[in-house]
Amino acid sequence: MTDTVVNRWMYPGDGPLQSNDKEQLQAGWSVHPGAQTDRQRKQEELTDEEKEIINRVIARAEKMEAMEQERIGRLVDRLETMRKNVAGDGVNRCILCGEQLGMLGSACVVCEDCKKNVCTKCGVETSNNRPHPVWLCKICLEQREVWKRSGAWFFKGFPKQVLPQPMPIKKTKPQQPAGEPATQEQPTPESRHPARAPARGDMEDRRPPGQKPGPDLTSAPGRGSHGPPTRRASEARMSTAARDSEGWDHAHGGGTGDTSRSPAGLRRANSVQAARPAPAPVPSPAPPQPVQPGPPGGSRATPGPGRFPEQSTEAPPSDPGYPGAVAPAREERTGPAGGFQAAPHTAAPYSQAAPARQPPPAEEEEEEANSYDSDEATTLGALEFSLLYDQDNSNLQCTIIRAKGLKPMDSNGLADPYVKLHLLPGASKSNKLRTKTLRNTRNPVWNETLQYHGITEEDMQRKTLRISVCDEDKFGHNEFIGETRFSLKKLKANQRKNFNICLERVIPMKRAGTTGSARGMALYEEEQVERIGDIEERGKILVSLMYSTQQGGLIVGIIRCVHLAAMDANGYSDPFVKLWLKPDMGKKAKHKTQIKKKTLNPEFNEEFFYDIKHSDLAKKSLDISVWDYDIGKSNDYIGGCQLGISAKGERLKHWYECLKNKDKKIERWHQLQNENHVSSD
């Protein structure tokens, strides 16, 4: 016994151990290389704990691949829906919208990829190194996006990789009465996907020469007892993306034509699939018989509407020993949508202690799958616009040029976008502007200029322009797509600045989490805004003054008002302006403008004449007040201002310049204030 132990443990130097050799003792011990050969180690069976760890790693990798398959399936499904909704022939009519092309119709361009004729609304001009412009239809543009987002451009040349099947775990179980078949009791950590079965050609390549199809009944219950190796999802994605995303099956509960392409519609489809119950486990027959290639009735899925209709997806045979025979209904969606071809083949069955299939994953796992899909959060689109501040006329011009790649909001994979502008702080209907709505497009071209009047240099220093892109819905609420914001103090006067910015989700305006001096400045700025809040809510008025020597009197022009306060319940006002030259000159001292219905930015362009000597004008003051007209009750006061010698600031300067420069019209913007006033009647 002692000799056996001594022979088994030898010193690394292959020499006998000497007790007085300290250097050899410091070198340590090692296992004799002849004690356990590689062949003996390979024949040893793995323990149940090791198999559990391996199965968990495989299941976790499969879960990530399944989520990736679903994400790519949604992208390709949206592309196929766009292909099904074509309305023209691509020759005389636009392939997308069906609009007439030619001399009597719209101008047409030829798609670079599909060589079909499209109108300029449905075509997108792409940048290229070629001297002539390159146009793509929206279908081909979407197909290129699918290639980029699915990784097909990368996996096209990616080498094949194989993940092993989970290993059966042997547990000591009580003996069952004779005649009762052994049931599958041990669940796997994660459900398996039948779409991972390899194609028939791959199986024949991996099968040794001379081996016939059928289960291997002589294999020992260990490493060789599990099923054949399967293909990775990346390999299948590569093969399908190389065929221009064709042959994908639309087995999302019957058809995808009625399913919305919005994220909410996708999540509803996922939850419906996850709610389906899993079929009960089927007892394993003994001994197992070879599986026939013919699929059972009702297992063949309908081929997708791609350009290769002959490519169909078959469900795996319903043999109890087949690894993917019992699977949740949710996997029916994952397999075909991922574009796999599960060709019928024979496989070595599991042993009688093979693990059973788990029920569908819980809602938390479904939410994880949705959160893993990051495309919906990053494809809001880009907006191209330009800004110009005309300092002389106190005018801010915002030209909305175009948007590209907007997020699809309608069931047809398109949107009805429009752009609206707000000035912050104090966003309201009074400072909201919007463009027209363009129908059924994700790449709208507006080329529309929106103007803000009465924007002073002070406004440019403390205001922010919010530009939002929304989708118009005739039968419901308009949906928000994305927005961007620009601080006007960064804009130089009389210099146009162009922007091409990616849209973002709603940006919070609260200054949360600021500390120290930054927090102090934030509170100071908010306090300043609150102090002038009453002034801003009243609005502004553009007034022109000119003393005419020919007519011998003062000509007052009321041009427009902007950003007036809303006085009616509908969020608007019915404004008019009243003039009163003080001290009282009788009835000829009072004038009124016309009433503008339901607006907060009225444009009057009216002039009024006061017959007065130039020497007497210095003793007078002009009271200007803006009112909201109401029927059956007293009018509401919005705001006013007073020009004259007793005024201050810009009002005094305006009055003084009028007296100094005869026969010269001088225009100034004035802030409306909640001053003391008399009745408008």
Swiss-Prot record:
Residues engaged in binding Zn(2+) 2: 111, 114, 137, 140
Gene responsible for this protein: Rph3a
Assembly description: Interacts with RAB3B, RAB3C, RAB3D, RAB8A, RAB27A and RAB27B. Interacts with RAB3A; this interaction recruits RPH3A to synaptic vesicules. Interacts (via C2B domain) with SNAP25. Interacts with deubiquitinating enzyme CAND1; this interaction results in the deubiquitination of RPH3A. Interacts with GRIN2A and DLG4; this ternary complex regulates NMDA receptor composition at postsynaptic membranes. Interacts with SNCA.
Residues annotated as binding Ca(2+) 2: 410, 416, 471-473
Biased segments, Acidic residues type: 362-375
Zinc finger (FYVE-type): 88-145
Organism: Mus musculus (Mouse)
Residues that, per the record, bind Ca(2+) 4: 568, 628, 630, 636
Any one Gene Ontology cellular component term annotated for this protein: synaptic vesicle membrane
Gene3D superfamilies for the chain: C2 domain, Zinc/RING finger domain, C3HC4 (zinc finger)
Full protein name: Rabphilin-3A
Binding-site residues, Zn(2+) 1: 94, 97, 119, 122
Biological-process GO terms, alphabetical: intracellular protein transport; spontaneous neurotransmitter secretion; synaptic vesicle priming
